[in-house]
C-alpha cells in the first residue's frame, strides 16, 4: 500500500475531509473527495482546493464528486462526514468498495466505528484520531491551522501490517500518521 497506486476516497469533504484529502493529493496520492455540497464540489473541480494557513496559501488539484458511482473501486475510505449523515453516506458508496477496502474514521466522538462496522463488516474498519484542525472559509476554501499528527490502529488494539503500510504511505504523502498500539486510548487522550 505504500505507493501512489493506493486509491483513497474521503467521505465528507468538509474542513477536515478537505484537509486530509488535500494534503495527501498535494504529494501525489490518488484521492477523491466525496460530498453532497454541490457548490463546494464544483468549486474544487473548477479551481482546485484553496488551502490557506499552515504551509502557505495555495490551490491543490484534487478531484471531488457528489456521485461516487463514477469513481471505480477504492483501497481506503477516510470517513469524515457528520455523524448524522454517516449511515446514508456509507450506503451511498457501496459500489466503490471491494473485499479489501479499509475504512478509517477520524470523526470527533465515539461510536462511529461501530456504525461503520455494522454496514461494511468488522474486518474492514480501523480506528483513527487526529489533532489536526481546519475550518471552511467558503466553497472550495479551507484554513489549515497546523501540522499536527494523527493516529491509526486496529480498532480492537494492535499494529498490523496494514496499519504500518497506511501510516507510512500517508506520512510519505504529507499527512503525519502514527501507528498506535491502542487507538481507543489515544482517542480518549485527545
Task: Identify the residue ranges that each predicted region occupies.
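Short, charged/polar "capping" segments at the starts of alpha-helices
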Residues: 40-43, 113, 160
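NAD(P)+-binding Rossmann beta1-loop-alpha1 motif at the extreme N-terminus of oxidoreductases
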Residues: 1-50
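Active-site-adjacent segment of FAD-dependent monooxygenases/related oxidoreductases
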Residues: 54-58, 155
